[in-house]
């Protein structure tokens, strides 16, 4: 399939060619050329050398400035600006048909989250393997005090309300023993729920939807995550603009000096051209050296390796920490199971275990049905199961610290990410720039060209 040439590059090239042709036509025209030559000859024929010497420093400033702008446009604004033009935002793009901009990461938070989830589930973690690290007895012992209180209240309230004759007809000692037995068996209920969950976690947890939803609803967390993971690379991008800009500026200075001396009328387009080149190339080179080469290469005794890939161990540690802090933690996992894609399946899992628990707590199901009737028994059972399920969100938070430690998601992600091949590890940060890097590069070129125009008319015209 033939790759389409990026529209941003095509537009920039057409604009530059059109401007150059217009300028050439104007200078070729007798009147236009005469006006330009008269202007140049009317000025002091000897341009101070310090003005030429400023060119590399201005180029360094352009390189730094365009790179800073590129980074700002990557992360901000979090929402489309201006807001009144949001209706015209191109779907899946950071820009709008009528203008405006939204940071690349905020505009594609969902897509980037999908890429990272695919990386995690295919290369780093198996969610079923992770959940097998839970110990049902330990989980139950932590949550049991909360569940005992709930169980006592549920049984006393429901049986007294739904079967008052049966309940009040029982001796007080029997009632207390029945409630005590239910409370004692609540730990077993929790163990059964966790054991069932460990076996069927694929059916009740949609990890990708969870992470993508969290990313879309918390764009600031996604931005902060990428900023912290790639902090040193972003500093490199900013500073490299100075170094590369200065180097390109030295070439620009030499070329412009001779052109200005021998064909001064050509200077009007030369500085904007070099400005475009500096802005374009500093962004281009900075983005390339971060991710290329993926594997270390020796060239003339020097080892070349992508700046980001050199920090694989350090980045893996930071990524794993932030991933658990913002996304893959016990609180979010339970929230997804209870209210997410497969919430009906999770509810069914809890209910079947709660129903077994109720039958055990009652003692003789047959006797109970004979006394209060099968229909009433089922009605009471359904009510109690409903209340047990409704109590889960209030009781389970006490186990989050234990679960986070037992699941060990942070440690697992860190250790396995540190061992990833370079081509896989590169996918952690590169998607931030990959799809829209050409837009950032062209913006750098346009800003550089505008600086070149200002530089020419302020210093040399």
Residue ranges of each PLM-predicted region?
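Transmembrane helix-loop junctions at the membrane interface of multipass transporters and ion channels
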Residues: 39-44, 251-265, 459-460
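Helix-loop boundary elements of multi-pass alpha-helical membrane proteins
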Residues: 1-11
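Bilayer-spanning, highly hydrophobic alpha-helical transmembrane segments
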Residues: 211, 233-254, 434-458
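Short hydrophobic alpha-helical membrane-entry/anchor segments
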Residues: 25-29, 67, 71, 258, ...
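Low-complexity, Pro/Ser/Thr-rich intrinsically disordered segments
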Residues: 19, 24-27, 34-42
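Large intracellular
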Residues: 36-230, 265-428
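Hydrophobic, aromatic-rich alpha-helical transmembrane segments
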Residues: 4-5, 44-57, 234-238, 242, ...
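Cleavable N-terminal signal peptides of Sec/SRP-targeted secreted and luminal proteins
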Residues: 9-21
């Amino acid at each position: 399939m033939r790759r389409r040439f990026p529209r941003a590059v095509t537009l920039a090239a057409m604009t530059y060619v059109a401007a150059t042709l217009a300028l050439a036509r104007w200078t070729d025209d007798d009147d236009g050329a005469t006006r330009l030559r008269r202007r140049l000859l009317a000025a002091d024929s000897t341009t101070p050398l310090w003005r030429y010497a400023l060119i590399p420093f201005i180029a360094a400033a352009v390189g730094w400035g365009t790179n800073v702008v590129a980074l700002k446009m990557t992360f901000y604004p979090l929402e489309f600006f201006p807001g009144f033009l949001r209706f015209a935002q191109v779907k899946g793009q950071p820009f709008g048909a009528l203008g405006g901009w939204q940071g690349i990461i905020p505009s594609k938070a969902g897509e980037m989250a999908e890429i990272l989830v695919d990386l995690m589930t295919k290369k780093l973690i198996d969610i079923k393997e992770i959940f097998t690290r839970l110990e049902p007895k330990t989980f139950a012992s932590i949550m049991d005090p909360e569940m005992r209180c709930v169980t006592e209240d549920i049984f006393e309230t429901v049986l007294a309300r739904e079967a008052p004759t049966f309940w009040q007809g029982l001796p007080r000692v029997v009632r207390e023993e029945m409630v005590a037995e239910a409370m004692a068996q609540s730990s077993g209920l929790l163990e059964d729920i966790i054991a069932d969950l460990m076996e069927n976690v694929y059916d009740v947890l949609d990890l990708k939807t969870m992470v993508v939803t969290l990313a879309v609803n918390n764009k600031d967390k996604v931005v902060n995550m990428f900023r912290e993971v790639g902090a040193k690379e972003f500093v490199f991008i900013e500073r490299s603009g100075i170094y590369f800009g200065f180097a390109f500026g030295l070439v620009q200075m030499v070329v412009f000096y001779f052109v200005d001396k021998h064909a001064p009328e050509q200077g009007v387009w030369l500085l904007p051209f070099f400005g475009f080149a500096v802005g374009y190339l500093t962004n281009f080179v900075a983005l390339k050296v971060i991710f290329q080469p993926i594997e270390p290469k020796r060239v003339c005794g020097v080892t070349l390796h992508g700046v980001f890939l050199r920090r694989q161990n350090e980045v893996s540690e930071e990524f794993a920490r932030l991933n658990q802090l913002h996304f893959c933690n016990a609180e979010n996992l339970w929230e997804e199971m209870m209210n997410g894609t497969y919430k009906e399946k999770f509810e069914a899992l809890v209910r079947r275990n709660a129903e077994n628990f109720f039958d055990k707590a009652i003692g003789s199901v047959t006797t109970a049905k004979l006394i209060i009737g099968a229909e009433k028994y089922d009605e009471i059972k359904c009510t109690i199961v409903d209340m047990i399920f409704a109590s889960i969100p209030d009781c389970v938070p006490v186990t989050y610290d234990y679960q986070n430690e037992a699941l060990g998601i942070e440690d697992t992600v860190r250790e396995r990410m540190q061992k990833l091949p370079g081509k896989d590890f590169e996918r952690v940060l590169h998607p931030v720039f990959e799809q829209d890097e050409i837009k950032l590069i062209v913006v750098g070129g346009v800003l550089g060209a505008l600086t070149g125009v200002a530089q020419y008319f302020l210093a040399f015209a």
